């Protein structure tokens, strides 16, 4: 079961699982959940179930109901808010059902989710890091930390929400006034042509199964173009970071290669929005984790080192009866309820 299937991360996980069905003859039956019946992923799974938002009291009971009704073996969070919520609920879900919640340990999730702790973790372990300070609501950035340009983003971030490049004091004041939450001001690492996102696939006991490095171009915080990259210096550093972190499933590490080394600014303790691309390249992280958990042999993947990817906008089509049923809370079965036009 994949949660939050309206998100790009969840949809990428679904694509990877479907690719495993095609390429490796798996028999994964994919159940998707979301609080929004309009979410495209609700029409791309084998069964779709409407759920409350993850901070609502009824969320846990609804998940348990779906898991029991469908014999769910693995539960994979597809959004950052659900990553946090399911970290708190994991023990109870696994006690009440036979499912396994695919999550990293709580402390490592917190290291990734708290952007100040991310920088502190890197600093404490001797890795290159961006200078980072906390900004409490109502307080201004200390003058000694005003080295512009700089990045300002929520301390407890979700993707690129709230992130902004700040070029001067007036701009930072206006930006902070928009948010009633803790923020961080972070050193701007200006090496956009040397930006990499790195995938680390972990097994059930923390074994590092494989790594992949992608060089990417961003637009509004999202990967628009990516290519598999050979970067020995980046590879060495992510292996060193993996040796300190305790991983389960996947980590996504983002940073830029500079004269100081590979400066990491994001450690996302979850599957990534580029999970599907990685699967096509040879590293299918959701499938690798599931097979390893089931005590099956997971061979070292052969990565297609020449693969590139460019994203484009697409649509998912479905009929009004299907949409109305989901809107009213009915679970949809009978395979995929929608389709993508084969334009190309």
Residue ranges, per PLM feature:
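ATP-dependent carboxylate activation and anion-phosphoryl transfer catalytic cores
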Residues: 70, 232-344
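Phosphate-binding site of ATP-dependent enzymes
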Residues: 164-246, 256-257, 261-263
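A conserved helix-loop-beta module that forms one wall/lid of the active-site cleft
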Residues: 95-162
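Short, hydrophobic beta-strand segments that form beta-sheet elements in well-ordered domains
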Residues: 29-34, 132-133, 166
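ATP-binding N-terminal substructure of ATP-dependent carboxylate-amine bond-forming enzymes
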Residues: 1-102
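Short loop/helix-cap segments at secondary-structure boundaries that form the rim of catalytic
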Residues: 39-45, 141-146, 175-178
């Amino acid at each position: 079961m994949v949660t939050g299937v309206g998100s790009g991360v969840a949809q990428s996980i679904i694509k990877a699982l479907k690719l495993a069905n095609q390429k490796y003859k798996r028999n994964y039956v994919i159940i998707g959940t979301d609080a929004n019946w309009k979410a495209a992923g609700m029409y791309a799974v084998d069964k779709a179930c409407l759920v409350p938002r993850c901070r609502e009291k009824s969320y846990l009971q609804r998940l348990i109901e779906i898991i029991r009704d469908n014999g769910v073996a693995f539960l994979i969070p597809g959004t950052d808010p659900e990553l946090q919520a399911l970290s708190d609920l994991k023990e109870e879900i696994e006690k009440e059902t036979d499912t396994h919640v695919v999550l990293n340990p709580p402390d490592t999730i917190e290291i990734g989710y708290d952007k100040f702790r991310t920088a502190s973790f890197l600093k404490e372990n001797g890795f290159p890091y961006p200078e980072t300070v906390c900004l409490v609501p109502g307080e201004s950035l200390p003058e000694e930390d005003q080295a512009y340009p700089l990045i300002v983003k929520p301390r407890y971030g979700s993707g690129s929400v709230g992130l902004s490049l700040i070029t001067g004091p007036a701009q930072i004041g206006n930006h902070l006034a928009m948010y009633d939450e803790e923020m961080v001001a972070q050193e701007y690492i200006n090496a956009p042509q040397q930006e990499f996102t790195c995938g680390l696939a972990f097994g059930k006991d923390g074994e590092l199964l494989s790594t992949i490095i992608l060089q990417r171009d961003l637009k509004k915080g999202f990967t628009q173009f990516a290519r598999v990259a050979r970067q020995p210096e980046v590879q060495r550093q992510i292996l060193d970071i993996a040796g300190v972190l305790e991983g389960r499933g996947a980590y996504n590490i983002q940073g830029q290669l500079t004269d100081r080394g590979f400066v990491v600014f994001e450690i996302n303790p979850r599957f990534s929005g580029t999970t599907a691309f990685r699967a096509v390249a040879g590293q299918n992280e959701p499938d690798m984790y599931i097979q390893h958990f089931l005590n099956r042999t997971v061979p070292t993947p052969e990565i297609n080192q020449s693969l590139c990817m460019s994203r484009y906008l697409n649509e998912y089509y479905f009929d009004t009866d299907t949409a109305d049923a989901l809107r009213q809370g009915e679970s949809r079965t009978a395979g995929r309820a929608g389709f993508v036009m084969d334009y190309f």
